[in-house]
Amino acid sequence: MEKVASGSELSGRNVACWNPVLFQPKSGPLMLFYKVGDDEPEWWGEYKTSSDEGKTWSKAIRLPDGFLGPIKNKPIQLSDDCILSPSSIEYYKIQNNDTSEVWLTHLELTSDLGKTWKKIGPLNDGKDFNVIQGSLLSYPNGKMQILCRTEYARRIYQSWSNDQGKTWNSWSPTELPNPDSGTDAVMLADGRALLVYNHSTSDGRDRDYLNVAVSKDGKKWYAAYVLENQKGDFEFSYPAVIQTSDGFVHITYTWNRERIKHVVLDPKKFVLKEIQNGVWPE
């Protein structure tokens, strides 16, 4: 296996690379975004491009100061071909001898395949609640939704936009449980949204339960598939999901912190049951 990115390429020192995100624009090279640094408050964004489907890669390009690129989940491409990336920052605030962690979600927009960038947000103030690692969904009716993990309420939180991501409504909880764990989502070719997440429940389940849900409107969700369900000392986390041109859905995730698992699903074969009151149906 060939190493594609190294933290030392631009920094000149042995430093970690984090959270790689692949994105294929409608036209232009394949893009690989990643973070470089010792930890979240200190890291910066870099990216590379490939014109031969990932066989070879350009030299690393550092994003402008203050820009990190898509923090965990892939960007989306808008109708005007601008690329909109869900991003977020994490840092520690010390006040009255008390240290608290602050998570702020924002968006990063490029109209020229990464040459220049514009920031939208932050979308939360970090005072009432923290949200990070958003997934962007653009529905056929023109509305846009961002779904984020949060420390609070053991729910996935959401915000909505009616103007292609320029402005956003107030945050609210979805009905979907989540144990402060990473998620990912994709719009299917048939116009439905598909979400991969840990559907934790009130019985104390955590990251040992990994699920797939779908929705037509981002409000009412339906259970579609259970990827993992192993009670005990197991962890299945940090999913990534895409749909390929043949219609199949490809999902990768960390399998018990030992390896990466790849699952292929046919969304035409889903047998859907409505998720009511946050309970995964039998």
Protein language model regions, located:
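Asp-box/BNR beta-propeller blade signature and adjacent active/binding-site loops
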Residues: M1-E282
